Structures are given as C-alpha cells and as structure tokens.
Amino acid sequence: VGMIVLNDAYGTGLATNIRSSVESAGGQIIAEEMFNEGDSQFSSQVDAVAATDPDAIVVISFQQATSIVPLLTAKGIDPAQLFFVDGNTSDYSGDLDPGTLEGAQGTIPGPFASDNFKESLLEIDPALKDWSYAGESYDAVTMTALAAEAAGSTEGTAIAAELQGVSADGEKCFDYAGCVTILREGGDID
C-alpha cells in the first residue's frame, strides 16, 4: 500500500492508524509521501508512490485530492486502487471528469445515514448535502435534551451530571418521545 499524506496532525494521525491496520492484516506500507498544507504541486509525491507499483493507494487530504487524483490516473493508477478518508470523500463531479473515481472507495466517520434519517434532516434543512457527523450530532442533542429532562433543569452542570444516567443500565428506548415518557413515569432509561 502506498500513501500520500497531508503533513499535519490530521494526516499523520490517520497515516499512523492506517499503517497499523494494514500491517496487522498482513499488509505492508511500501511508500509514504508527505505534502504540506498550502502545497499546490504533488507530482513528486505521486511519482514516488506510483514508482513502487502499490496494490492500493491511500490519499489522506482534503480538497488537494482534485489535483492528486488526475496525476495518479495519468500514471496509470486504476481508480479502484484509490482509497480516501473523511476529509476528501466529497462530490467531485464539478472538479473531475466523469468516471475518474469509478471504483474508488472512502471512509466517512460515524454510522451510515439511512435514507429515512436523511429525509428527516432535509425536512429541517433542504439545502443539506453533507451527512458527516449527522448521526453523532443528532445523538448528542437528544442525549442532552434527555439529560435536561432527567435533571429537571437547563443548567449545564445539572445536565452533565445526568448524561451517564440516561445512557446506561436502564430500560431501552429508541426515540426521544419514548425515552421522555419513561423518564416522566419515574423510570430509568438507556
């Protein structure tokens, strides 16, 4: 596996974890080339990684992917060999030719946003296009509201004191209304 990595805490942190995962699965990182924020030329990194003929290439970047990917494909790298991270899994239809990323894969943090969940969010904000952290944000707001209900207060310290209590060792509930009902009936929720 080859890697082209943004040289900052985000990029190097991901690279360390990817290296660990690849190696623990029996793979090997055969090339790792860094670039700095603000760089606009990536030919040397692409040339160095492509020269090792890796089975896969991980691109740890943000918008720089729009410059890096065409250089990789011009070197004969099949898009199916490309792997992206949350920072560069975006809609590149306005930046790259159709088919440029066909077969490429990427990761996005958090749970998969179901169509029903997306539809619910679009009812609130029809312009929403990015679902990154949507599930976590929804859960955080819901947990905070439930903790406020359990505390009977909107004071930050009171809410904080109840967060663990509304998320462990109680009756399972799966929506806000159901959880609030249990709390208001004197029950304990999880």
Name the predicted role of every residue range.
Residues 1-190:
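Extracytosolic ligand-binding ectodomains
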